[in-house]
Amino acid sequence: MVTLGKADLILVNGQFHTVDRENPVAEAVAVRDGKFLEVGTVAEVMQHHCDGTKVVDLKGHTAIPGLNDSHLHLIRGGLNYNLELRWEGVPSLADALRMLKEQALRTPSPQWVRVVGGWSEFQFAERRMPTLDEINDAAPDTPVFILHLYDRALLNRAALKVVGYTKDTPNPPGGEIQRDANGNPTGMLIARPNAMILYATLAKGPKLPLEQQVNSTRQFMRELNRLGLTSAIDAGGGFQNYPEDYEVIAELHEKKQMTIRIAYNLFTQRPGHELEDFEKWTDMFTPGQGSDFFRHNGAGEMLVFSAADFEDFLEPRPDLAPGMEDELERVVRHLVEHRWPFRLHATYNESISRMLDVFEKVNRDIPFNGLHWFFDHAETVSQANIDRIKALGGGIAVQHRMAFQGEYFAERYGIEATRHTPPVAKMLETGVPVGLGTDATRVASYNPWTALYWLVSGRTVGGMQMYDHSARLDRDTALMLWTQGSAWFSSEQNQKGQIKAGQLADLAVLSKDYFRVPEEEIKGIESVLTVVNGDIVYAAGAFGPLAPPAIPVLPEWSPVVKVPGHYRSAPPQAARVGMSVAHHCSGPCGVHNHQHDFARTSEMPVSDDNAFWGALGCSCFAF
């Protein structure tokens, strides 16, 4: 035990679940210079107290290592976060449409209202998509773009006008512009079979100026901190160009304003010129180059465009191009020669089989020899291919896309086919490294607790039971994959992922005891105190006075001003107390001015503290 080091921060009287088998549970931790100094009993930790030490009493709260999303499009998502209205977790379509209408009134020309990913029609009480008529009624004049998973986008008439889609606009390759009986676009764009039409249309929208992109990225990181996230591996992404789209995150790193650690992969943007991109980048970077907050992590998730098999389960499985292997081999051979780690998007087992043929061929000539590489997604990977991945020393980064698409998958392939899609338990039994993540923001939600709920319960966000007991994970295992497991995918397994002396001091103190609450309550967990590098970056509730200063949202009309991220449901009693304190017009009943007759006939959810208007703090907002 270290007895001489003095701590900068001490947290006591917590239930620290450390993900360290040698010391699985602790009462207290001491932090110095951004790393854990001591993890143990209160008496052991308080030996490191000195006059300058900040001491925080956790009063029995559960604490865990900071969560690490092994596949998040944080850099791209940050640039756009302040532009986007979030429907994540919203319980009814009626509330979602009210949110849309309110934001349309606040959004100035020429800006759009954008709902970009993170939701499913099955999460709504109505269990359906919005109609184009409903969207046009909610926003008759302001352009609206609503992205649903990888399968479709809905545009109102104003958006069709500004993007220029008319009767004479041809369907692009791989996509369809739905038309009415007269051949005019209806506003529905369909990915058939890939999502390029959706992303290309979204890219036509106005961008934020640089100053507001910086603010937007900081807001997104603060939202992730609220959910207990402290690290992410950025998977690049379509229309995320290097170096121009990395200027904002580089500025935040230089100014020491990052509150999420990022390891980033480089994603080629030029079909037919992928090898040229990687030849240039391997001359510029060494894997691991950077700091503990912002470091290079290799190539991917796109290595060659011919290897992309988008997971639109409303459409048949796509077959990859016949020449894919030759193109992929040239890139992988170059990466292995330069000892660059790589990741590759692969949804279907059929794609994975062909990709593994390439990897095995390269390995015979240039041994991988411990090089970290992995598949992303792998929903339908077979046991035979899991064995092949293990033999090559690879891993699998799994995301909760099936929590949003399980119903569609079951409709196409049958409920039995969903039972092990993806087969996470089998991956672990085989000994393959597994890390967990979200693939946010354009498809699934960035909320790690939605993913943990899915893994533990086996249910989608719509409540469909996908997995039986054999395919579900216990809570400790699921947490391990979100912490220590994900660290392998940035080659940082000895630096982060555990509450352990010598590791980076990243942790989250939870609003509820993840290990004991009913399964349905897992998805509502948040952090009440998030620590990154030994610094408190987020605090709420009883720990609110410890929070860093709030960052004003820019621009002032941003959806984040009114809807600050993922839908959050407060405990009923706490919410009602908060409403009556903040708004004297409300009492214990939670109804504005006690106007029960009006409330009973109103369409507004005036007394529901978990509905849209109530979530703003008071039903006054409804009138």
Could you describe each region identified by the protein language model?
Residues R333-R343, T347-W373, H377-A378, Q383-D387, ...:
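His/Asp/Glu-enriched, well-ordered alpha-helical/loop segment
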Residues E274-G288, V398:
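Substrate-binding cleft/loops of secretory-pathway carbohydrate-active enzymes
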Residues L79-Y81, G164-T166, S353, E407, ...:
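Short, function-defining helix-loop hinge/capping sites that tune catalysis or transport
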Residues L252-K255, T282-F294, I366-F368, I389-G393:
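Acidic (Asp/Glu)-rich catalytic clusters
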Residues A7-D8, G14, E38, E337-H338, ...:
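In a subset of proteins, long, contiguous C-terminal domains/tails are tracked
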Residues P172-P173, K280-D283, G437, N494:
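Glycine-rich, charged/polar anion/phosphate-binding loops
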Residues V2-V12, H17, R21-K280, R295-S351, ...:
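Divalent metal-binding segments
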Residues V116, L147, Q399, A508-S511, ...:
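Residue-level recognition of conserved beta-strand edge/terminus positions
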